[in-house]
């Protein structure tokens, strides 16, 4: 979900259409480069088609157009149009092979809190199921975490988090939302980076583990460590890179042995 730290106000958007290469759910571009919403949308549809070739994407297309209109003139700290964020949330959900209602909810997860669009309008356009998902994500985003008591209250907060979501898909959308926010933390202040990282370590990563979503859990852990204890993280990266040739040689030896049989 977005807060004051995620928005950079309004300004005219300069369209910088550039080729976007996407590898394992990440955009391979320099941080200062813009990502074109249309290219990201096509990447989303390609992902959906991969696990559901006959999927009816009409609802997803409609959600994208409505979300883009609702978030127009809104920008993230990075300077990107705000629609980039819900698009990435939807892409993460597609990587998890979620149904179209969940992907649509991911695309619209911020509209009730951050725009003039209402739940009744979402229900009228997309049905009650999607509206309930968006409502659930909005309510989870309103949970207050006490920085001073977060560690002591972590288990109770996790239980509250799980209890508030009547549909497990609400939590999955929220995890996807947090994951993309963590991926773009370089645009936040150091204090906010540490605060969000601690929340993620204590609340979000353990919930992802409980749900068996190891892919998200692992990345949340990595990103949290990167911003909460950057010295430790950088040392780990250095050690892993130093051992990379050794690991690659070992893998090649194993492959060679297997090939003999």
Regions found by a protein language model. Give the residues of each.
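Active-site helical microenvironments for divalent-metal-assisted chemistry
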Residues: 2-261
């Amino acid at each position: 979900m977005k807060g004051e730290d995620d928005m950079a106000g309004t300004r005219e958007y300069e369209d910088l259409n550039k080729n976007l290469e996407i590898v394992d759910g990440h955009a391979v571009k320099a941080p200062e480069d813009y990502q074109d919403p249309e290219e990201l949308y096509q990447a989303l549809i390609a992902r959906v088609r991969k696990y559901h070739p006959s999927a009816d994407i009409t609802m997803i297309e409609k959600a994208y157009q409505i979300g883009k209109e609702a978030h127009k003139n809104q920008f993230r700290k990075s300077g990107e149009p705000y629609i980039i964020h819900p698009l990435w949330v939807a892409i993460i959900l597609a990587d998890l092979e979620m149904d179209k209602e969940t992907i649509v909810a991911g695309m619209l997860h911020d509209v009730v809190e951050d725009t003039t669009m209402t739940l009744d309008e979402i229900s009228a356009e997309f049905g009650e199921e999607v509206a309930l998902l968006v409502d659930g994500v909005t309510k989870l985003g309103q949970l207050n975490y006490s920085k001073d008591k977060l560690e002591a209250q972590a288990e109770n907060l996790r239980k509250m988090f799980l209890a508030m979501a009547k549909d497990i898909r609400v939590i999955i959308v929220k995890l996807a939302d947090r994951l993309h926010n963590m991926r773009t933390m370089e645009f936040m202040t150091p204090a906010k980076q540490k605060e969000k990282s601690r929340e993620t370590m204590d609340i979000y990563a353990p919930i992802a583990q409980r749900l068996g979503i190891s892919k998200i859990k692992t990345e949340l852990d990595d990103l949290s460590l990167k911003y909460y204890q950057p010295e430790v993280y950088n040392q780990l990266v250095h050690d892993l890179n130093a051992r990379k040739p050794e690991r690659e040689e070992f893998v090649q030896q194993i492959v060679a042995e297997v090939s003999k049989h």
